[in-house]
From Swiss-Prot:
Entry EC number(s): 1.14.99.60
Principal EC category: oxidoreductase
GO terms for biological process, alphabetical: ubiquinone biosynthetic process
SUPFAM superfamilies: Ferritin-like
Record family assignment: Belongs to the COQ7 family.
Protein name: 3-demethoxyubiquinol 3-hydroxylase
Keyword Cell membrane included in the entry's annotation: yes
Length: 205
């Protein structure tokens, strides 16, 4: 029951409250930059997609922590969720600075990620960890692509994305070391297809 209450609290905080980071944003010490209208529009779209990714991460980790009966794994999942909360706060701060807003479909993204996390976790802890590994690897690849697309002048956004990518790679490595099972190719393909729908939609809405 305590875990379910924690998950419900996380959902409410993720979707309806302004997230509080435990660590200052990597962009905090950087000066404001003067971007053109087109540059600002592109940065806003990419950071909105990144914010959606962090909303999904909260749903995924919370679902998995609700199901596992392994205290150490639950602790590790909740620790990863706290780090993802930093990312959530940083991307929201950057969206505010760019004069933009999060995706209007965040409740849908969170619910979908939570449902997928529940399904993966009910198979086994190892399968759940395998899902984490694949998710974090795909997110890392998306972030690398965003680093190539973000305007060179947008140093604050680039600093945030660079730090996020390094954190996601570490999360994948930790899940792998904890005994993750590799996902079958069809599952990886479905995840990529779902991510494509999400990123394309969040880019605009």
């Amino acid at each position: 029951m305590d875990t379910l209450l924690i998950a419900a609290d996380s959902a409410l905080r993720t979707l309806f409250a302004r997230p509080r980071a435990g660590e200052p944003s990597p962009a905090r010490s950087l000066p404001a930059v003067d971007l053109s209208v087109e540059q600002r529009r592109l940065s806003s779209a990419l950071m909105r997609v990144n914010h959606v990714g962090e909303v999904c991460a909260q749903g995924l980790y919370m679902a998995q922590s609700c199901v596992t009966r392994d205290p150490q794994l639950r602790s590790d999942l909740l620790a990863a969720a706290r780090e993802e909360t930093d990312h959530l706060a940083w991307t929201r701060e950057r969206l505010d600075a760019l004069g933009s807003r999060p995706s209007l479909l965040n409740p849908l993204w969170f619910a979908g990620a939570f449902a997928i996390g529940l399904v993966a976790a009910r198979v086994s802890d190892q399968a759940s960890l395998g899902f984490v590994v694949e998710t974090e690897r795909q997110v890392s690849a998306h972030l690398q692509g965003h680093l190539r697309r973000l305007p060179e002048a947008d140093l604050p956004s680039r600093a945030i994305v660079d730090r996020m990518q390094r954190d996601e790679e570490r999360h994948a490595a930790q899940a792998q070391a904890a005994g993750a099972l590799p996902l079958p190719p069809p599952a990886r393909w479905l995840m990529k297809a779902a991510a494509k729908v999400m990123t394309t939609t969040a880019h605009h809405i």
